[in-house]
Amino acid sequence: MAKKVGVLLFIDLQPLPDSVEQWVKKTYHAELSGGATLQIVFNTQEACKLDVGTSVEAVVSLMHTPGRHSPSFLAEVARVLNPGGSFLVLEPLLVETQEQKYSSTQTNAGLERNLLLAGFVNSEVDFVTGVEIAKACTTSSVALNLVAVKSKKPSWDSASVFQLRKGSSQKGRARTNGNHQPVKFTAGDVMDDVLSMSKSVVKLDLTSNFKDDDEELIDEDDLLTEEDLKAPEIPKAESCAPTKKACKNCTCGRAELEEKEEETKLTAAQINNPTSSCGSCGLGDAFRCAGCPYRGMPTFKLGEKITLGESWLVADA
């Protein structure tokens, strides 16, 4: 019977340094317990394909060549890694401020993005310096920073099915904790979701018959002042109202109004032989002053009789 593979190690460095194998076995001793073995894959290419039945608890990928952790390679690792398994990537990477000299070279942000798209979560980036595993995988051909990225595969897998529990039939709402035990809501659980209510209660007495003799009633007449009780003064009518014209001793101002009306009336002489002291009366109302006697009359020529034009004598349709 074939032994179960606990940890899968990808590396493009041969021969394999003893320090690397010792470090992997020490770090992943829990995954290698119970008879599980360490499987090592050398010279990994970008289009790496593993056996269909491969299933491991942890994957370690140590590459001294930049750009080996392509999206297709990360997707293959995600396929063989069990849900909840850990994944460690070690690769020379450029910092974001450096110019990319090689098309296969990635940055920290680019590698994290590819890990996320492949389905890995909780990625943590660490710069590895002064460690034996880092010395074994460094290269002098390109000035890069050796970066270790730790991530995990979610505990759930794609197309996973979860059964929803029905609500508790007991009185009151219930919820479940991590041990799947029903927990009842308390008043403290909902204090943030409801408005605080005052403990004081306003009591209304609706038994009163409103016939208490001790109650004092206010007389509305007491609210009136002496000025309110005075009768209003009726305005006096004009002294010459019954007559058609103002009387001799007019004091109401009617005589002045009649004088102004007389001044504005045109005489026969003004119609037959119109004159103008300003010279603008015959041009129309737009050029006439406010007290002009010719206001409302059509345009005319000075010295000629004022007549209405034919358009004035035709009724509007």
UniProtKB/Swiss-Prot annotation:
This is Anamorsin homolog 2. Its cofactor is [2Fe-2S] cluster; [4Fe-4S] cluster. Residues 278-292 are annotated as: Fe-S binding site B. GO terms for molecular function: 2 iron, 2 sulfur cluster binding; 4 iron, 4 sulfur cluster binding; electron transfer activity; metal ion binding. The C-terminal domain binds 2 Fe-S clusters but is otherwise mostly in an intrinsically disordered conformation. It comes from Physcomitrium patens (Spreading-leaved earth moss). Residues 1-162 are annotated as: N-terminal SAM-like domain. Keywords: 2Fe-2S, 4Fe-4S, Cytoplasm, Iron, Iron-sulfur, Metal-binding, Mitochondrion. [2Fe-2S] cluster binds at C240, C247, C250, C252. One of its GO terms (cellular component) is mitochondrial intermembrane space. Residues 163-229 are annotated as: Linker. Belongs to the anamorsin family.
